[in-house]
Amino acid sequence: MPVITLPDGSKREFAHPVSTLDVAADIGPGLAKACIAGRVNGELKDACDLIETDAELSIITAKDEEGIEILRHSCAHLLGHAIKQLWPQTKMAIGPVIDNGFYYDIDLEHKLTQEDIEALEKRMLELAKTNYDVVKRVVSWQEARDTFAARGEEYKIAILDENISKDATPALYHHEEYTDMCRGPHVPNMRFCHHFKLMSIAGAYWRGNSENKMLQRIYGTAWADKKALSTHLARLEEAAKRDHRKIGKQLDLYHMQEEAPGMVFWHNDGWSIFLELERFIRRKLNQYTYQEVKGPLMMDRVLWERSGHWDKYSEAMFTTSSENREYAVKPMNCPGHVQIFNQGLKSYRDLPLRMAEFGCCHRNEPSGSLHGLMRVRGFTQDDAHIFCTEDQVQAEVSSCIQMVYDTYSTFGFENIVVKLSTRPEKRIGDDAMWDRAEEALKQALRAKNIEFTILPGEGAFYGPKIEFTLHDCLDRAWQCGTVQLDYALPSRLGATYVAEDNSRQTPVMIHRAILGSLERFLGILIEEYAGRFPTWLAPMQVVVMNITDKQADYVEEVVKFFKEQGIRASFDLRNEKIGFKIREHTLRRVPYLLVVGDQEMENKEVAVRTRDGVDLGKMRIEDFAAKIHQQISLRSLKLLEE
């Protein structure tokens, strides 16, 4: 007689084993209709799975995040169902859930076209609208293998042979005549899977190994209702308009080419923004009392072996050799910073020592993963390492957190998700050390009233970590900032200081990044602002235009004055209509468009309008410069208003 405890603490007693669906029906028909799955004693289960003993139960619906993931997973099976109807010879590989959707890798000789995808989506909807039940069967390993062998599903057989123990009991999910294998759970009925769209096709190697066969990967998205799907598709459409690769080309910010994959060719305007970002962070470093250093681009392999990077990271490192010595181009700055710390005797009085670098790093990312500025091989890291005593950890972490929030708010990012990764199973140090380290990070976050979630076991083997993920205007998540404690690297590389009792001690090292990669952060900003940078970041802040040749000399004087004031300004003296000039510079997203006619020239004024089309009227050039200076010094995100 199982007793089921619900989230509100209420209990329901049953005379026989029950499923989550039975419990939902016992509560009410509405909940039974909405029930997708259950969380039984913390574990997700299919709605049909029987509960035979006392248990805590949460009923999962499409309102829950887990419910959305489950229906997406079931849409992947629905995709398989439709594929096998349209192309019966298809061999199915894997079909997992991903952010906002799902995909399925398939082996099909016929190369799918956009017309095929549309036909596939249509068939999926036809199948889903029959609202058929999804039937789960738990079978022996051998029966599962025999089932897929009879269907010629070689990839499913490979999964069984290579990944699933022979004494396991795999679950088979039957979608009418189509059968798939999965850990589950899945929706009990296809009425939950009416709101989806197939998005794109790509190539993908089986098992992610380039030595294996290239499969076709079909991506899709799925949501609980029509409104959520429409909202997501509208967001994707807006994201496409904001694509930093497209805007970067339109605004002539940078380019990339095949001869240097994953490496950025910065053009004048893009480099101007990059340098402004760097100047901004440099001012923060001064405010928070950091030393700025510069380490070598590459170092002998021996040093990377001592640091431990060679064992764990060598495949991602670029190497070269000279005079019988092997060198590695640095993928990160930390070992170099320890070398700088080790120069000269350090005392406890020297700590904390905060060392920062705009380090030019390189990582040999797979070519297929490269994506504009967001995923590159050569990048600049706004990296810092703080050497401190264990007693100083909490205060230093607190300072890092403040710096992160100060920085992100300047760019308009207020929605920051914070996660704390704690001790993994394999780790250095004793439990007491980890207790102190994790507690120091927790206290630093709590002291600033920052909500955070704990990721148990997700920390590095050498220390716990805080991750800062910002959400942009399209609610996309970008993990940028990190604060990582390291109890291993200083010891491996021989870093010590003289303690107050004259003993030699190893400092704690705090790895700190705020923007992460400057290239990636600039890509994020391009998309966040859609290329409409705030005045302080804009590569060209002001453009001054004449109406006739008569005003040309005055326009040049105005621009010279602005440049002397430190304002990035240019002129447009072309023999074009003023409306044409305004449109062109509006498309270039220049914040302020200044027009000069006879009257403005006579009164030593300019007619000011913004790229948004707001007419600010006439101003004396000194007054306009003062207003712009104030905007720049405050790093305002808004333009001047009427």
UniProtKB/Swiss-Prot annotation:
Catalysed reactions, semicolon-separated: tRNA(Thr) + L-threonine + ATP = L-threonyl-tRNA(Thr) + AMP + diphosphate + H(+)
Is DNA-binding among the key words of this record? no
What subcellular compartments does it reside in? Answer: Cytoplasm
**Record keywords, A-Z:** Aminoacyl-tRNA synthetase, ATP-binding, Cytoplasm, Ligase, Metal-binding, Nucleotide-binding, Protein biosynthesis, RNA-binding, tRNA-binding, Zinc
Region spans: Catalytic: 243-534
What is the superkingdom listed in this entry's lineage? Bacteria
Could you say which EC number(s) this protein's record lists?
A: 6.1.1.3
Q: What is this protein called?
A: Threonine--tRNA ligase
